[in-house]
Amino acid sequence: MRIDLNADLGEGFGAWTMGEDEALMQLISSANVACGFHAGDPLIMDSTVRRAKALGIDLGAHVGFPDLQGFGRRRMNIELKELCAIVVYQLGALAGIATAAGYRVTHMSFHGALGNMAAADAELAGPLVKAVARFDPQMIISSSSSEAIEQAAQACNLRVATTFLADRAYDENCLLVPRGIAGAVVKDPEQVRARVAQLLQDGTVTTLSGKRVAVNAQSILLHGDTPGAVELARSIRHSIEEQGGVITPVSQLLGS
C-alpha cells in the first residue's frame, strides 16, 4: 500500500520561527507551505521551496485567511469574491517562487478556519475550489474528508487527496473537533502511532467520543506546529512501514 505523509510547514514570519521544518522535511513526502497570509513570508517560502526541491518532495500551497495574529485559526466574514481572490493570490505567490526555483506546485490545501468552514459548507467550497481550478486545472486538492469539497472538486474535474489528520481528533461526522475542546490535539507519539495503525488496518478512526468511523485517506497529515512534531512524524513513518506501507508523494499517488 502506498500513502502520502505530509506536513504544514513554512509557518514562521520574519525573525520568528515556527516548528522544526528542516527535520520534518527529512521524514515526509509532501509539504504544505504557508503563503504569507496566515503565516510565512517571501524568504521563508523561498527557502522551503528550495529545500523541497532538493529533497524531491511534493510542494503544496497552504492557503488561509489574512490573519497573521490569529494564525488563520479565527473565522472571518469576507465577501466571497474577495475570498476567492485571496486564494488565487496565495497560489500565485507560491507558484511564482517555485517557478523561479525551477520547481512546481503540485497540490493545495485550505488552512485552519478557512478549511473548516469550506469543509462544512458547499456554498463556500464550490466557489473556492472553482477559483483553484481556474488557476491550475491540474492542481490536486488536499483535504480532510469533506463531501462539500469533494463534490466541488468533482464538478471542476480536480483530483482530491483525502487526508487523515494524525494529530487531530475527529467527531462522529468525521469532521475535526474544534481546537478549543480538550483532546482536540493529539500529542502523544504512541497514540498517534496507534491511530495511524488503525487507519491502515481497517480504514477507521476512533472519535473523541469513542466511536469508530470510516475514513478514506490517501494522505496522512501532521501539523508542523504541534508540540513534538518531529517525534510524531517518526512515529507515523514507523507505523506506516510496520504495516507494509510505502510513503509516496501525493502527485505520484494520483498520477500528476
UniProtKB/Swiss-Prot annotation:
Top-level lineage group: Bacteria
Keyword ATP-binding carried by entry: yes
Catalytic activity entry: 5-oxo-L-proline + ATP + 2 H2O = L-glutamate + ADP + phosphate + H(+)
Top-level enzyme category: hydrolase
Gene3D superfamilies for this protein: Glycoside hydrolase/deacetylase (3.20.20.370)
Listed EC numbers: 3.5.2.9
Pfam families documented for this protein: LamB_YcsF (PF03746)
Biological processes annotated in GO: carbohydrate metabolic process
Record-level Gene Ontology MF annotations: 5-oxoprolinase (ATP-hydrolyzing) activity; ATP binding
Listed InterPro entries: Glyco_hydro/deAcase_b/a-brl, LamB/YcsF/PxpA-like
Keywords, alphabetical: ATP-binding, Hydrolase, Nucleotide-binding
SUPFAM superfamilies assigned to the protein according to its UniProt record, in alphabetical order: Glycoside hydrolase/deacetylase
Quaternary organization: Forms a complex composed of PxpA, PxpB and PxpC.
Stated role: Catalyzes the cleavage of 5-oxoproline to form L-glutamate coupled to the hydrolysis of ATP to ADP and inorganic phosphate.
HAMAP family to which the protein is assigned, alphabetical: PxpA
Family recorded in the similarity comment: Belongs to the LamB/PxpA family.
Protein name: 5-oxoprolinase subunit A 1
The organism's taxonomic lineage, starting at the top: Bacteria, Pseudomonadati, Pseudomonadota, Gammaproteobacteria, Pseudomonadales
